[in-house]
């Protein structure tokens, strides 16, 4: 199993090391560059201890998995670990899921300017539903039908009302891990969206 580690931040390191403990990870994909928060060494050490190869992403890469593909986009932001993470487009047939990580609206704009993103069926809302992510420009460009928000109890107010309203105005079905628990998405292979 390959794993994509979208960005190197303290609040994400334990998740990666936990996955390495539980899953047989062949290759770990990481954003190239130094990390501001300092966890890169811990991730590299954990990958080595579990026998996982590490590949740094510097250009768009497409990985085929049977009837599905992952398109991994390199960092497009300039400052801060949130802006220098990987983005991932998971595709199966005519269905697409986009994960932008914790990037803000300015970096989402750069992502849209740099890569040709399709209309998507599902979006993992950026930065746990922060008001600074999941911009209207991104929603207008990729037109998601479903939004998933990975969030737990926090002191930041995530997800924010602004983000929830943007998603509702877009017509998205909204699913939140804090309210709904683990979210499973599946598509009927016979079904076609477009």
Give the ranges of each region predicted by the language model.
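Non-globular, low-confidence helical/coil segments that flank catalytic cores
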Residues: 3-194
